[in-house]
Amino acid sequence: MKRLSSSEQSLELFDRDSPQEYSCILPNELTVSASALRALEDSLIEKLPSGLTLGIRESVLCETLSNKVPESVIVHLALGDVRGEYISLYSANVKRRLKRAALTPAVVKDYYTDSYQRYVCKRRRIPCVDLPGTREPARSTVALLFYPAIQRNPLTQKPFRLQKDNKMFVKCWAEIWDALNFIQKYVYYMRPDEITTPSLDTSARLELLFGYVKTLYMWAMWLMDLLDTRIVSNKFGTRVPISIDNIFSNLTEVMGSLSSDKWMSTALLCRSIEHLLSSLIHISSLWTCCQWRETKHGEMLRPIVSIVALVSLLHHHCQYIINITFNGYARWLEGGLGNPMLRSAIRQQKRFEHYLGGLFPSIRPTAWGELEFSIRAWFELALAKSMVIHGSLLKKSIVSNNVLEPLCKPRHTQIGERHDTRFTRSTSMPSSSGHIHSTLQNNQQAIVPECSSGQLSSIATALWSADELQNDYVEMKGGVLCPAPQPADSITPNSSQTNNGTASDGSPTRVTDASLDPTEVESSTTVAETPPVTVAVESVYVCRETARNKSPSSKVERILRRLRVATD
């Protein structure tokens, strides 16, 4: 047989009797989506703690249905994060601000005493004489907002006369600081992987945390009442209408009355909260029964610094839980931003800011999200994965009667309705072509996102008409806000407004966006209502079943296998 040369073989390909058709070879959607997802993952993976990328977490979540996260996995990740990786970016940004402000312990003590003196003078409506070098609002705000949360040791270790009382105080402070840190780890690592699927156990944990936040704010105001009583001889009156026993008993009754399914998913969280409450009870007995240390001139500088630092620490912790909710966790909350437990916690925070906002500054969710960038990075990556798996159009839905239906309908924004950024409490995720709409009606379940396929790194900004939670703010540098003075009745719910977005006088309610500049007003457009999407339930869980059976070695391969099954 004659052997053909290479050139003759190449010509043989075109000399066949039947014509050969050639297609245009281009990367398909699967390859492009995987490449984009891999590039996004490589750019964001360094900003996330190692606990969120552990193989044991991924394998357990793949074996768990209904988008649940077992509490044993959460505690395992929280205890394993010894170096505080979950808050490393946030701590680095805060420490950089503290270093830029040149805040030493002695300087912080001066700011605390001076801030409390100005707070007392303002309440008594008398002129205040500032100490030399302490009238710097920017440095004072940073010291009051961040310093106790970064430094584990108390500023003053001897606020009492007796040595045994001081030792007990230092011990209680360390226990409180460690307990708050562990609960923050728990909150950070309790998120599920699927951001488009409801998570009932995550919602139950969030509701328990909101009740816990409400209790901490009430106890903080009780402690400030105790300090004011000792300093100015009770000229102001109490700000907490119930006793300290009832403050803690209300939360313990809530934890004791949890249903069996909620108790199964929050048992270890309840134990951690009870441990913190016991430390707060011990330190309450110290401030109530023990003798406070005074200077030669009768001034109680050390007790003032200790109590202000403790209340600042608790306020920072409560803001962490609330701000992380507005930066994405509200996606899994039953009822969304209209959840009654969330609104109760926000109302208590507003009450705290109304009475003590001049002493303890607050940070809005948008500024907090810039400091804690790992939350935004994780949600960008999770949204990209969901868009690759489920397609370009995302609908947050619940399972009802064997179909998937939207949790609630988007709210219509009336043409000409003005946006006022003073009244705002919304998520600080990047905005997209759609918005996460929320409602205040009781019968609606959660928020509905609409995302564009061309924006993988976009989670819509929430538009929340929080009329009964409105509060005037005076903006300070760095995203830190202090509430303006308001009458006492402004913290009560506004009953003159109805659920249809209008007040009793017919005027439209205000819809705001925290990502806007306060000096700008966004032009309003009509948001079209999206019809419900009906999909078979089996198609939602086919990807999870595939991941359970295949057990791919990498996250990208797992996503590709899910996508192949979904497209077949």
Swiss-Prot record:
Biased composition (Low complexity): 521-530
Alphabetical keyword list: Activator, Host cell membrane, Host membrane, Membrane, Transcription, Transcription regulation, Virion, Virion tegument
GO cellular component, one term: membrane
UniProt record, GO biological process: regulation of DNA-templated transcription
Spans annotated as Disordered: 484-530
Subcellular location: Virion tegument; Host cell membrane
Composition skew (Polar residues), residue ranges: 489-512
Tagged with keyword ATP-binding: no
Coiled-coil segments on the chain, per record: none
Organism superkingdom: Viruses
Membrane topology type: Peripheral membrane protein
Keyword Zinc included in the entry's annotation: no
Transmembrane segments: none
Pfam families tied to this protein: Herpes_UL46
Signal sequence, start to end: none
Family as reported in the entry's similarity comment: Belongs to the herpesviridae HHV-1 VP11/12 protein family.
Record function comment: Abundant tegument protein. Trans-activates the immediate early genes.
Name of the protein: Tegument protein UL46 homolog
Upper classification of the organism: Viruses, Duplodnaviria, Heunggongvirae, Peploviricota, Herviviricetes
